[in-house]
Every structure is written in structure tokens, then in C-alpha cells.
Curated annotation (Swiss-Prot):
It holds the Pfam family Ribosomal_L20. The keyword RNA-binding applies. GO terms for molecular function: rRNA binding; structural constituent of ribosome. The lineage of its organism: Eukaryota, Viridiplantae, Streptophyta, Embryophyta, Tracheophyta. This is Large ribosomal subunit protein bL20c. Belongs to the bacterial ribosomal protein bL20 family.
């Protein structure tokens, strides 16, 4: 049986990882061991930050909604709005509410004033 040299296969594998780390600075884009380490770190960071991005956007949406609500009505807060939305079974998520808050503040004020009216009617019936 003939001997198979694996130099070309190893070179191809290293070239693939080199392409992945081509944007790194210094030795991290040139030396094979450092490229491997950098690749692992980059992929770990990407995985972690995909989840972090979701949390960051949720915080941003909540901040925007709360800011618009507190500008218009002093005694009303974000938590009260979300509680009342759930009670009335309105299917508006935080992303949609934040978009409404940015594009048309009057529309958001109409939504929470309608919720307040419904809430007072329910209290009057009890």
C-alpha cells in the first residue's frame, strides 16, 4: 500500500481557519495556534452576544415606552401599562409599543387613555 502524505490536507484546513481570522490584528491572523484560539474566542463571543442583543433591545423598548408614557401622564408608569394591557388581553408586545411610541406618540396616549377608561368602568361596575 502506498504512503499518503497529509500535508495538502492540513494546509487546506489551516487556510480555512485563516480565512475566518483574516480580520484579526497582528499575529492573531498569521500564526496557526493563535488563529485557532482567536476563532474559538470569536465564536464564543458571537454566541454570547446574540443572547445579549435580545436583552439589550428589550431594555431599549421598555425605556422608550416608559419615557413617552411619563411625558404625557405623570401618575402612569410602564409597569401599570403592561399590567393593564394583559388584563384587557391586548396583544401588543414591547417592540410594537416602542415603534408606536417613536412614530406616533399620540397613538400611544390614545391606547393608554382607552385602557384607563376601561379600568374605571370596571371599577364602577364592582
Amino acid at each position: 500500500m502506498t504512503r499518503i502524505k497529509r500535508g495538502s490536507i492540513a494546509r487546506r484546513r489551516r487556510a480555512k481557519t485563516r480565512l475566518f481570522a483574516s480580520g484579526a490584528r497582528g499575529a492573531h491572523s498569521r500564526l496557526t495556534r493563535l488563529i485557532a484560539q482567536q476563532t474559538i474566542r470569536a465564536l464564543a463571543s458571537a454566541h454570547r452576544d446574540r443572547d445579549k442583543k435580545k436583552r439589550d433591545f428589550r431594555r431599549l423598548w421598555i425605556t422608550r415606552i416608559n419615557g413617552v408614557i411619563r411625558q404625557n401622564v405623570l401618575s402612569y408608569s410602564y409597569s401599570q401599562l403592561i399590567t393593564n394591557l394583559k388584563k384587557e388581553q391586548l396583544l401588543l408586545n414591547r417592540k410594537m409599543l416602542a415603534q408606536i411610541a417613536i412614530s406616533n406618540r399620540n397613538c400611544l396616549s390614545i391606547i393608554y387613555s382607552a385602557i384607563i377608561i376601561l379600568e374605571t368602568k370596571e371599577e364602577g361596575q364592582k
